[in-house]
Amino acid sequence: MARVKRGNVARKRRNKILRLARGFQGSNGSLFRTANQRVMKALCNAYRDRRRRKRDFRRLWIARINAAARINGVSYSRLIGGLKKADVRINRKMLAQLAVMDPKSFTSVVTSAKS
């Protein structure tokens, strides 16, 4: 069997990793071994944090809605329960936007949930 020289393939693989590691500090962006470790870690963190971001934003929306609801004299859980009973189909993201950008219309939503 003929000998296989891996020059082009190996260089392409290493350059791909070094391209992904561009901007990393020190040897993490310039030496293949350390860059490979940093890139693998970065990709793992990115995968995990894409899922975590969804949770974090939902927590932020709930905190904002709760704060605005308490200003209007109702707790978050009672507000959400009231909205479900009143058949108001508005999600937490939109409620949080209303609470921050347009408090008057948020107050009208709260009054519809109270009744």
Curated annotation (Swiss-Prot):
Keyword Metal-binding listed: no
Pfam families (alphabetical): Ribosomal_L20
Gene Ontology MF, one: structural constituent of ribosome
Signal peptide: none
Keywords, comma-separated and alphabetical: Ribonucleoprotein, Ribosomal protein, RNA-binding, rRNA-binding
Keyword Cell wall biogenesis/degradation set for record: no
Example of a GO cellular component annotation carried by this entry: ribonucleoprotein complex
GO process annotations (BP): ribosomal large subunit assembly; translation
Gene3D superfamilies: 6.10.160.10, Ribosomal protein L20
PROSITE patterns, per the entry: RIBOSOMAL_L20
Function, as annotated: Binds directly to 23S ribosomal RNA and is necessary for the in vitro assembly process of the 50S ribosomal subunit. It is not involved in the protein synthesizing functions of that subunit.
The family this protein is said to belong to: Belongs to the bacterial ribosomal protein bL20 family.
Full protein name: Large ribosomal subunit protein bL20
Source organism: Prochlorococcus marinus (strain MIT 9313)
Gene from which the chain derives: rplT
